[in-house]
Amino acid sequence: LMEAADRVDSTAGVQMAYMKRWAPRALKPLELRLPALLPGEGRATRADAVEIAAEVEADLVYLDPPYNQHSYLGNYHVWESLTLWDKPETYGVANKRVDVKTRKSAFNSRPGIGPALEAVIERVKTPNLIVSFNDEGYLARAELERMLSARGPVRVIEIAHPRYVGARIGIHNPKGEKVGTVGRLRN
């Protein structure tokens, strides 16, 4: 259902905001498809990463934590509602869940991200840990490397990537008037 919803959304990549005009794909019918599954055991978990990290034991762990004030709950609130099937009270043009305002993660605050990520890095049981992180995040690269080096050798692979859409189009006020300037275009 989540994949089907993703194929017909009208967003610029995340669900925190929507396009001013309907995207052509949003007018297509919702089509459920059986996803391609890899053979073998698998597990899906909906939990706080800090709380569940000690239970994770794997050959390889990939972490993609939030890196600024934008929560994954706010960015992907439609998927949260689909998985919970709870029909929550919503607000705004994007119809975000009201609990987006109160369900905050330590990863979404400057003082909280360091201790939270360090706890996950320390607790997860894996010989191979991959961490994806943005250079505009609350956590400095040197601090992230320090945390990771406590586990062993660290190899950094930098990948230039286009910045999020808002950075490419500039900052606009609620009336739609451009009030900011476009910054650098790549991370």
Regions found by a protein language model. Give the residues of each.
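Conserved Class I SAM-dependent methyltransferase catalytic core
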Residues: 105-152
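Short, glycine/charged-enriched secondary-structure capping and boundary segments
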Residues: 59, 75-78, 144-146, 171
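C-terminal catalytic and target-recognition region of SAM-dependent MTase-like enzymes
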Residues: 139-187
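Conserved beta-strand signature within the Rossmann-like core of class I S-adenosyl-L-methionine
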Residues: 86-94, 127-134
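Long, charge-dense
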Residues: 83-87, 169
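A short, conserved alpha-helix within the catalytic core of class I
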Residues: 71-80, 112-117
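Hydrophobic/aromatic beta-strand patches that form the interior of the parallel beta-sheet core
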Residues: 45, 130, 155-157
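SAM-dependent nucleic-acid methyltransferase catalytic core
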Residues: 1-76, 87-103
